[in-house]
Amino acid sequence: MFSWLGNDDRRKKDPEVFQTVSDGLKKLYKTKLLPLEEYYRFHEFHSPALEDADFDNKPMVLLVGQYSTGKTTFIRYLLEQDFPGMRIGPEPTTDSFIAVMQGDVEGIIPGNALVVDPKKPFRKLNAFGNAFLNRFVCAQLPNAVLESISVIDTPGILSGEKQRISRGYDFAAVLEWFAERVDRIILLFDAHKLDISDEFSEVIKALKNHEDKMRVVLNKADQIETQQLMRVYGALMWSLGKIVNTPEVIRVYIGSFWSHPLLIPDNRKLFEAEEQDLFRDIQSLPRNAALRKLNDLIKRARLAKVHAYIISSLKKEMPSVFGKDTKKKELVNNLAEIYGRIEREHQISPGDFPNLKRMQDQLQAQDFSKFQPLKSKLLEVVDDMLAHDIAQLMVLVRQEETQRPVQMVKGGAFEGTLQGPFGHGYGEGAGEGIDDAEWVVARDKPMYDEIFYTLSPVDGKITGANAKKEMVRSKLPNSVLGKIWKLADIDKDGMLDDEEFALANHLIKVKLEGHELPSELPAHLLPPSKRKVSE
């Protein structure tokens, strides 16, 4: 009789089936989250509605910093070529937002044309008006790096009130719009003249909901000596600790990101290691792009739910006829109490609420009579999406990761550090002697042989027990020594001959010098007598 009730129930329990993560995100947003956003005017308070291009676009990297910290030079270093509209100098040069993207031919697309292109994820930027669009361009060029990622260059942040007023648009709001949609935010600081102006502090605070995307680069570190670099690094961490309100330590990369010779090469190895870490982080973006979009949708859904509770609470408190203006002022002033009540009634985390001061400012300009009462059905749909459909998409994300080839950023500066003698760590640690004709272990073998013959070899081999007595003198943990034993015991007979023993000691030396052990023994470390056997 009431079969339609059962059908509705079943529909609720069974999550939707999607072909790809991107299609799933689009469908969930349009059918389940967007109706809630529109009903409670979410877009007027927080963020414009998402479009298909927001789900389809490549990973984006946003560069933010004060003027002359090396933002544009950093992009030039990554791409290993100039891009249209690029200007570099010690004075404030970049006066526009430049989206550096892949294109078949080099050229510049002006802002007004860019925001009407449905294939680009910038259509909603038209809300910032002509003052901004005249300062926004897209630089297109064919480049291998840009096949995997896009980079957003921003105007340098200046000190003083004039730069804030004379821009003609809300600079912090534009940055926040980009921060919501990019995969990585890189804050650049100049090690040679470390300074965090009030404007820069405000910008960092505006990005506070996106700390998980933030990385810090202390650039131009080759201009100062080691002792000064330590002081500058300490000062930077102290300053950031006051601005970024997070208990976790933000990751700071130290280096000199340009293609000129290092001015002070004392810390060359440090810079190389830091550059590799940063490059690995950027290279992982295409692989994690779907997960990032999923994470951002969840974050947006949680904010939309809280916003719905706030708006419906304000509607409920408003009188129907008299004293509306007085009540409106009272409600805005007591918004903190409303936050507290919603938090208790609906068990919502305080971190999910929008900024109190900003919300109060926005509410002053709103007509409360146009607000809508609580509509439980809309909220239930979003709750159902978070509980069931998102879990389904998480499974799909993992499936796509395993089925597709590993996606990495290639070309430009990423290419020069992967292989060959200038690859990171080439010829060091277990890689030492990779290009030598002679077996690298042979250099120290006479010393190892002296120890070997004191360990009572039988038929030219020592037992595992005797080898252990000598190997534990290194004070390395048993787990590490066990791995060294597996690598050195090439014929797997549970004993070591003189060459295998020398190899084990060589690997111990590699580990004690701070290098990682290989998972498999490299060909150049194979003892000469064992090479024919392995072949």
Curated annotation (Swiss-Prot):
The residues covered by the EH domain are 444-532
Show the Pfam families listed in the entry.
Answer: DUF5600, Dynamin_N, EH, EHD_N
Q: Where is this region: G2 motif?
A: 91-92
Question: Coiled coil where?
Answer: 198-227
Effect on the protein upon substituting residue 327 to D: Loss of localization to membranes, reduced binding to phosphatidic acid
Region G4 motif: start-end pairs: 219-222
Give the bilayer topology: Peripheral membrane protein
Q: Where, subcellularly, is it found?
A: Recycling endosome membrane; Cell membrane; Cell projection, Cilium membrane; Cytoplasmic vesicle
Give a brief account of the tissues where this protein occurs: Strong expression seen in the kidney, brain and liver. In the kidney, expressed exclusively by glomerular endothelial cells; at protein level. Expressed in skeletal muscle neuromuscular junction perisynaptic region; at protein level.
- Domain notes for this protein: The EH domain interacts with Asn-Pro-Phe (NPF) motifs of target proteins.
Q: What does this protein do?
A: ATP- and membrane-binding protein that controls membrane reorganization/tubulation upon ATP hydrolysis. In vitro causes tubulation of endocytic membranes. Binding to phosphatidic acid induces its membrane tubulation activity. Plays a role in endocytic transport. Involved in early endosome to recycling endosome compartment (ERC), retrograde early endosome to Golgi, and endosome to plasma membrane (rapid recycling) protein transport. Involved in the regulation of Golgi maintenance and morphology. Involved in the recycling of internalized D1 dopamine receptor.
Query: Can you say what this protein is called?
Result: EH domain-containing protein 3
